Amino acid sequence: MAVLGAPGVLCDNGATAERPTLDHHWDLWKKTRMRRNTDQNEEDVRRLIWEKNLKFIMLHNLEHSMGMHSYSVGMNHMGDMTPEEVIGYMGSLRIPRPWNRSGTLKSSSNQTLPDSVDWREKGCVTNVKYQGSCGSCWAFSAEGALEGQLKLKTGKLVSLSAQNLVDCSTEEKYGNKGCGGGFMTEAFQYIIDTSIDSEASYPYKAMDEKCLYDPKNRAATCSRYIELPFGDEEALKEAVATKGPVSVGIDDASHSSFFLYQSGVYDDPSCTENMNHGVLVVGYGTLDGKDYWLVKNSWGLHFGDQGYIRMARNNKNHCGIASYCSYPEI
């Protein structure tokens, strides 16, 4: 398997040349990920991107083995995509301007919070979803937060319809653009006004379609949403510990280190606070002495650690994870 670790060869023009020794691994990856490139030019482009990502993985993990990184990366179903393509297909967070607040969390400074929380252990988190090539991250983040509240309120864990939000919260009053992007609080406002169907009655299609909301299939509603103080990780910790899963926006969906993340605590110094992706914080803790947020993504089980990523906590609001946080109340 030494061949797999060989980095790509750089041509004079800076492009990465295909390595024939990787032919078998490329074919194996395509078969595993069910990739079929009918156009030879497309095949060649994808192969070069894949080799570039493979080289990044090998170099990063070599540095990780020397203690230079707190996380490892690995090849996954996005291995033949560029960072720009990943954010174009799967990001699309649209922060409202101005950012309106329907309520804010009042911190209890004297409250003792647990050292770690994982709402999955309490049955408040549904299975990991796959948004596909639709910028609906915001919808999955919002529905995930409400699913947790619904479980805490009724004792029932129900998958809610992200497609309902994609199709129906696009009116001017909400400002969401379906697969073109949106924001979690606007989704909450739609649910306050209308309610939301279940995933079973309104399944996900990964594309913009006509609104088919049916009140007969209503699975949940909420009375208001709460927004946390901007950039306050302590407030986020308190909300996650005492209220449930929290919707957040992050930057880094467009970084190779993020979409190829595999394990450990993600901490990339190049991460900014330029929001481009909506996710769900379902817990927090400490791993090997490094504090983290436990984050549920909507990129399927092949992303990260079975669909989850641990992101650095108490690290100057790393990736802006505490900048735009909210959760609904039933």
UniProtKB/Swiss-Prot annotation:
Residues of the propeptide: 18-112
Tissue: Highest levels occur in the ileum followed by spleen, brain, thyroid, ovary and uterus. Low levels are found in the liver, kidney, jejunum and lung with lowest levels in the heart.
Enzyme class, first EC level, given as a word: hydrolase
Reactions catalysed: Similar to cathepsin L, but with much less activity on Z-Phe-Arg-|-NHMec, and more activity on the Z-Val-Val-Arg-|-Xaa compound
Induction text: By thyroid-stimulating hormone.
Positions glycosylated per UniProt: N100, N110
Annotated localization: Lysosome; Secreted; Cytoplasmic vesicle, Phagosome
Keywords of this entry: Cytoplasmic vesicle, Disulfide bond, Glycoprotein, Hydrolase, Lysosome, Protease, Secreted, Signal, Thiol protease, Zymogen
EC numbers: 3.4.22.27
An MF annotation (GO) of this entry: cysteine-type endopeptidase activity
CDD domains for the chain: Peptidase_C1A
Record-linked Pfam families: Inhibitor_I29 (PF08246), Peptidase_C1 (PF00112)
SMART domains per UniProt: Inhibitor_I29 (SM00848), Pept_C1 (SM00645)
Alphabetical list of PROSITE patterns matching this protein: THIOL_PROTEASE_ASN, THIOL_PROTEASE_CYS, THIOL_PROTEASE_HIS
Presence of keyword Glycosyltransferase: no
Leader sequence residues: 1-17
Active site: C137, H277, N297
Disulfide bonds: C124-C222, C134-C179, C168-C211, C271-C319
Any one of the GO BP annotations: basement membrane disassembly
Gene Ontology CC, one term: extracellular space
Nucleus recorded as keyword: no
Family: Belongs to the peptidase C1 family.
Quaternary structure (record): Monomer.
Known function: Thiol protease. Key protease responsible for the removal of the invariant chain from MHC class II molecules and MHC class II antigen presentation. The bond-specificity of this proteinase is in part similar to the specificities of cathepsin L.
UniProt-recorded name of the protein: Cathepsin S
Organism the protein comes from: Rattus norvegicus
